[in-house]
């Protein structure tokens, strides 16, 4: 072949060019102190094709494909269908007893055979979602240093300040549509995991592709490593990040500013940047700072708010009345709690035509120091001030429940076992059907379990949680707990922004997403006490959410893809990534 002759001339000739396989500086011949060139071929075939996760089909390569791409002899003779590969992998996966082992097996598959990974996720989402995302991903992040095998995503550290654009250009895929970025300071309910928080952007983008149909090659997970204040990690010899305390203040702000500018310069105006698991003090500031200049979305603030609002809208079929007829009490006044509260107030304002400020008075927050009230204004963080209402100080949740008498209790505290028997019983005494949402992740940090909610309320509670719980048998009835999982919202929300070429995120798009999700809950679901539709229908749900978001973007003049498609649901479905194997020439 001409290519091999050229390579021979280059490596064996006397023109001084080095780095070829046969050259003294080639990897097989060079001594440890000599430099080598990592040669590779651009066209994947043979051995390299089997190690290319985007194109590898494993034993599903046909006889014709094996001959055409030099795979003959590199694989056992059997040819399997993708369906049989799914069955084989699931059989092996189900033999593992430890969820972390299953998580690692799924991550290995993603690095080996991308299409099979996503086909499995799409076809078995209810079984596999808890493995690739909450709650198992939390343990995966905690142990990321010791289970780290191949790098996934882009790691940008303080050492790279001044070169971030160069790092973005190192990423092999050029047509990026969505970035999920974290600085690892508040990973789920687990705190500061530093660089090991990369498991979250990787997991989130897996769901963008599996549930929302965004092409995997258009997704970029990024960790901004600004250090960690977790002493355990700093002392861990296997920790993969910068071993220094977190950068703060001006140093941090300049670093993030360079990153955001580089992203826009490299990928353009319509690149979606999702902020993920930033600490409260940074999350609000970053969203506020960049929402007018970039297409940005914070899932912890906006995604959580949208999915919870959807559950509340759907629950009205069970509770009766309108949102404005209810009273809400939050345990937790951080980014999730205040984000949900603000979207609820906005929705009530839109429906009643009353000012948002008036609607906020129906919503009460409890933080670590007690009920958020006006007498505490001097010491409250800025984002809590809109929720500081006139009331005498109250320090405990049970006293707040008895004083406020809420119809809806929402937990976003990040601390487990906060909804005690006394609290749940009080909610059941106040309401015929108390709505209890224990949203903190992972499962160990949930404010109460499904069994506790149903048992302590004597079967009267309508319950949903952030992490999954099994159905509960109580006095001859089977209660199916709902899961207020952000995965209902953000994949379809992102697809909607991408498919219409949105240039900014508007709060009305979040309301549209909530209403689209709530519309997918049917009478059959309500009979079971569900306020969210089953996850098995997630691609259909995502298409409707995407259509709702895109329609609102067109209405607000924030969409750049023109003309507007006639049927946005069908258009969303046509845009979705298909993980079924393609035939090769």
Curated annotation (Swiss-Prot):
Induction: By salt stress. Pfam families: malic (PF00390), Malic_M (PF03949). The record marks 300 as: Important for activity. NAD(+) binds at residues 186, 300, 441. It is an enzyme of class 1 (oxidoreductase). InterPro entries: Aminoacid_DH-like_N_sf (IPR046346), Malic_enzyme_CS (IPR015884), Malic_N_dom (IPR012301), Malic_N_dom_sf (IPR037062), Malic_NAD-bd (IPR012302), Malic_OxRdtase (IPR001891), NAD(P)-bd_dom_sf (IPR036291). One of its GO terms (molecular function) is oxaloacetate decarboxylase activity. Leaves. Divalent metal cations. Prefers magnesium or manganese. The active site is at 133 (proton donor), 204 (proton acceptor). Its cofactor is Mg(2+); Mn(2+). GO terms for biological process: malate metabolic process. SUPFAM superfamilies: Aminoacid dehydrogenase-like, N-terminal domain, NAD(P)-binding Rossmann-fold domains. One of its GO terms (cellular component) is chloroplast. Its EC number is 1.1.1.40. It is found in: Cytoplasm. The keyword Oxidoreductase applies. NADP(+) binds at residues 329-345. It catalyses: (S)-malate + NADP(+) = pyruvate + CO2 + NADPH; oxaloacetate + H(+) = pyruvate + CO2. Plays a role in CAM (crassulacean acid metabolism) photosynthesis. PANTHER family: MALIC ENZYME-RELATED (PTHR23406), NADP-DEPENDENT MALIC ENZYME 3 (PTHR23406:SF64). Belongs to the malic enzymes family. This is NADP-dependent malic enzyme.
């Amino acid at each position: 072949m001409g290519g091999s002759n050229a390579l021979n001339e280059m490596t064996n000739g006397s023109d001084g060019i080095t780095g070829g396989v046969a050259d003294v500086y080639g990897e097989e011949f060079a001594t440890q102190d000599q430099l080598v060139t990592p040669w590779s071929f651009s066209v994947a075939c043979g051995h390299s094709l089997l190690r290319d996760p985007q194109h590898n089909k494993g034993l599903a390569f046909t006889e014709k494909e094996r001959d055409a791409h030099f795979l003959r002899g590199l694989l056992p003779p059997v040819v399997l269908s993708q369906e049989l590969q799914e069955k084989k992998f699931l059989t092996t996966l189900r033999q593992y007893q430890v969820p972390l082992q299953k998580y690692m097996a799924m991550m290995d598959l993603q690095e080996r055979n991308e299409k099979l990974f996503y086909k499995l996720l799409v076809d078995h989402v209810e079984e596999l979602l808890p493995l690739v995302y909450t709650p198992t991903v939390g343990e995966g992040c905690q142990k990321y240093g010791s289970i780290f095998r191949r790098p996934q995503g882009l790691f940008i550290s303080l050492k790279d300040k001044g070169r971030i654009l160069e790092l973005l250009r190192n990423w092999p895929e050029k047509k990026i549509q969505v970035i999920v970025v974290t600085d690892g300071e508040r990973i789920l309910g687990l705190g500061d995991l530093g660089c090991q928080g990369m498991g979250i952007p990787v997991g989130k983008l897996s769901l963008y592709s599996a549930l929302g149909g965004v092409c995997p090659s258009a997704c970029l997970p990024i960790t901004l490593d600004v250090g960690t204040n977790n002493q355990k990690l700093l002392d861990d010899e296997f920790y993969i990040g910068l071993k220094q305390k977190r950068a703060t203040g001006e140093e941090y702000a300049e670093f993030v500013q360079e990153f955001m500018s580089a992203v826009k310069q490299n990928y353009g105006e319509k690149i979606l940047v999702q902020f993920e698991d930033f600490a409260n003090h940074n999350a609000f500031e970053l969203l506020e700072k960049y929402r007018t200049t970039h297409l940005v979305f914070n899932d912890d603030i906006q995604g959580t708010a949208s999915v919870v609002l959807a559950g509340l809208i759907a629950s009205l079929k069970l509770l009766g009345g309108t949102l404005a007829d209810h009273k809400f009490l939050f345990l937790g006044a951080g980014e999730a709690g205040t984000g949900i509260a603000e979207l609820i107030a906005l929705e009530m304002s839109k429906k009643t035509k009353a000012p948002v400020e008036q609607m906020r008075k129906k919503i009460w927050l409890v933080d670590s120091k007690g009920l958020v009230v006006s007498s505490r204004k001097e010491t409250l963080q800025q984002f809590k001030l809109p929720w500081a209402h006139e009331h005498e100080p109250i320090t405990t949740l049970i006293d707040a429940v008895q004083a406020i008498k809420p119809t809806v209790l929402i937990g976003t505290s990040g601390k487990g076992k906060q909804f005690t028997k006394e609290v749940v019983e009080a909610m059941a005494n106040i309401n015929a059907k108390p709505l209890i949402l224990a949203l903190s992740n992972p499962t160990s940090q949930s404010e109460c379990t499904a069994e506790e909610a149903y048992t302590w309320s004597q079967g009267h509670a309508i319950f949903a949680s952030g992490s999954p719980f099994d159905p509960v048998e109580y006095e001859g009835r089977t209660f199916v707990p709902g899961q207020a999982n952000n995965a209902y919202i953000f994949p379809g929300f992102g697809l909607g922004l991408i498919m219409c070429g949105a240039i900014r995120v508007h709060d009305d798009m979040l309301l549209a997403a909530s209403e689209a999700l709530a519309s997918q809950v049917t009478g059959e679901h309500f009979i079971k006490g569900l306020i969210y539709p089953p996850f098995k229908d997630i691609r259909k749900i995502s298409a409707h959410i995407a259509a709702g978001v895109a329609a609102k973007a067109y209405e607000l003049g924030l969409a750049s893809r023109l003309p507007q498609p006639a049927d946005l649901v069908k258009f969303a479905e046509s845009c979705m990534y298909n993980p079924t194997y393609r035939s090769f020439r």
